C-alpha cells in the first residue's frame, strides 16, 4: 500500500517586491516591477498585483512594461536582502515542519507526513504558519496541500491572490488536474 503523504507548498508571491515594500513605504499600493535596471533589454522578473492589473507580466521587456503602465516603478533585485529574508522564512517554518525543501526565495515545500498527532491536520498547520508569517512580517502566502509536490505546487500557484489555501484530498488529484 502507498503511504499517505502530506506535502505543503508555501509560496509568498512576488517575494522580492514584498520585501522592498517592507523597507520602502512609497512602493506600497502602486505598480512595481522587479528587473535589472542598468540594461536596456532587461526583463521583468516579478510584478506587484497593481502592475499585473495594468497588464504587466513577468518575462516582459521593461520597455513594454513601461508603455503598458506609465506609473510603473522598476526596482532592481536585492539578492542579499532576499537571501536573508528567505533564511528567516526557513527558521519560521522549522517548528511546523521537520522535513522541508527550498524551491526558491519565498517558496518552500514542507513534508507534514506523520505530524498529525503533534500538530493536527496539515491544512490547519499550514493555516497557523500562514498567520504567523502575516503577523510577524506581513507576508501573505499561497498554500497548496496535497499528496505530492507537483499537485501541492499547482494547488498553490493557481490561486488568485494571497492569502489563500487549497487542499487537494487524496483521490481527487485527477479531477483537480483535469483541464
Q: What do these predicted regions represent?
A:
Residues 2-109, 114-116, 122-134, 142-145, ...:
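Residues that scaffold, gate, or flank divalent-cation-dependent active/transport sites
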Residues 132-179:
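Long, highly charged, low-complexity intrinsically disordered interaction regions
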Residues 1-2, 179:
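Short intrinsically disordered, low-complexity coil segments enriched in acidic
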Amino acid at each position: 500500500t502507498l503511504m499517505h503523504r502530506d506535502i505543503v507548498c508555501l509560496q509568498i508571491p512576488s517575494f522580492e517586491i514584498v520585501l522592498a515594500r517592507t523597507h520602502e513605504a512609497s512602493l506600497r499600493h502602486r505598480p512595481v516591477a522587479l528587473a535589472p535596471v542598468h540594461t536596456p533589454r532587461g526583463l521583468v522578473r516579478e510584478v506587484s498585483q497593481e502592475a499585473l492589473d495594468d497588464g504587466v507580466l513577468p518575462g516582459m521587456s521593461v520597455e513594454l512594461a513601461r508603455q503598458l503602465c506609465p506609473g510603473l516603478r522598476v526596482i532592481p533585485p536585492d539578492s542579499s536582502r532576499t537571501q536573508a529574508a528567505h533564511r528567516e522564512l526557513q527558521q519560521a517554518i522549522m517548528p511546523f515542519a521537520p522535513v522541508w525543501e527550498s524551491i526558491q526565495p519565498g517558496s518552500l515545500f514542507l513534508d507534514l507526513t506523520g505530524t498529525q498527532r503533534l500538530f493536527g491536520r496539515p491544512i490547519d498547520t499550514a493555516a497557523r504558519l500562514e498567520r504567523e508569517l502575516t503577523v510577524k512580517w506581513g507576508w501573505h502566502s499561497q498554500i497548496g496541500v496535497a499528496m505530492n509536490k507537483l499537485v501541492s505546487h499547482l494547488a498553490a500557484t493557481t490561486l488568485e491572490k494571497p492569502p489563500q489555501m487549497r487542499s487537494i484530498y487524496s483521490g481527487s488529484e485527477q479531477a483537480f488536474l483535469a483541464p
